[in-house]
């Protein structure tokens, strides 16, 4: 049995651009991993059936799961004569804007590639991930990146690790499609924000960071704006929604404010995590 950590990501800024012919949207985003993670246990079996299970009853174990989808997409590139039993110990909230499902899928793909000595090229991995989900390929990077296209074209940015992060999620989920369908025009990209974070001008970055999906998601889940306000009042340097939400994160340069915020919010919402960027 192999155990693999599968990390969540946050969007340090996110702008949604135009709709593509393939149904995806072009985006401009800055992403970074955080230490919040699921643990995936993988055992090879000699059947033709991929068996998924989890400690979370809301975790899909059917063909809608991205682990299943990425395994099927892998078979378009290589002949596979075995399958796997996969148990996911879920710590990352589901459908929360933290890409837990995409992370699970990518980690599974990379494990199978190694386990079966498939020798997939980077381009093959990129295409398998594209067929599976827009942000899946990011998890091969594991760095602070500016991502464009559908989120699969990367420029690595300066290290943004070891930042104090509070994650807050009220237990609700949001359909990304519902948010995308109600978006208006973009903010014109992340040029200045990218320069700020890459030059470690965090004061400018914290002031200019944005997520164009927030305005739509806040109408669907009103508590998002309330959580942001509480994080701001408790001393965070930046509060922002991740992805399409409803998860909100706060970045704290001051460690005492970070600890105090966690203490004040940890019993107030369904999911409150104290974590760091990787």
Swiss-Prot record:
Keywords: ATP-binding, Isoprene biosynthesis, Kinase, Nucleotide-binding, Transferase. Pfam families: GHMP_kinases_C, GHMP_kinases_N. InterPro entries: GHMP_kinase_C_dom, GHMP_kinase_C_sf, GHMP_kinase_N_dom, IspE, Ribosomal_Su5_D2-typ_SF, Ribsml_uS5_D2-typ_fold_subgr. Catalyzes the phosphorylation of the position 2 hydroxy group of 4-diphosphocytidyl-2C-methyl-D-erythritol. The keyword Ribosomal protein does not apply. This is 4-diphosphocytidyl-2-C-methyl-D-erythritol kinase. Its EC number is 2.7.1.148. The keyword Transferase applies. ATP binds at residues 93-103. Belongs to the GHMP kinase family. IspE subfamily.
